Amino acid sequence: MRIAKEDVDVKMEIPGAVIRQRTDFGDATGLGRISGECFTLSAGVDTTPLFQGLEGNLCQCPHWGFVLRGQLTTTDAEGTQETVKANDLFYWPPGHNVKVDADAEIIMFSPQHEHSHVINHMIEKVKG
């Protein structure tokens, strides 16, 4: 789910502050501890080979985040693609790969246990 910042409802606007809120932006019920993550990614990075060996060869962890700069495209198990770019909020449900279309920096919030499993898997893949 991609939402441009401009499409997030303004709940309050006063001199010096604009408060935007998107409700019902995914469900974290039962996911336990959440980790805050900062990723800096170069154009061309593709997680497909790094996710080989995970269930469905995809990241099975949901993520909520914000794109500070750049552009990324996710592909799900059915082949559906979605592109997020600078100033977009996003929710990536379980079952995705990510390709970096333009140098990017993102902030994500993910279930700590599930995403640590994925990150450790990628570390092992890179080691060879």
Task: Give the positions of each predicted feature.
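A short, N-terminal "cap"/entry segment at the start of jelly-roll beta-barrel domains
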Residues: 1-48, 55-56, 128
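Conserved hydrophobic/aromatic beta-strand scaffold that supports enzyme active sites
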Residues: 5, 20, 36-38, 64, ...
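Ligand-binding loop in jelly-roll beta-barrel domains
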Residues: 32-34, 94-119
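Short acidic-glycine-tyrosine-enriched beta hairpin
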Residues: 76-95
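Acidic/histidine-enriched, glycine/proline-rich intrinsically disordered or flexible terminal extensions
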Residues: 116-128
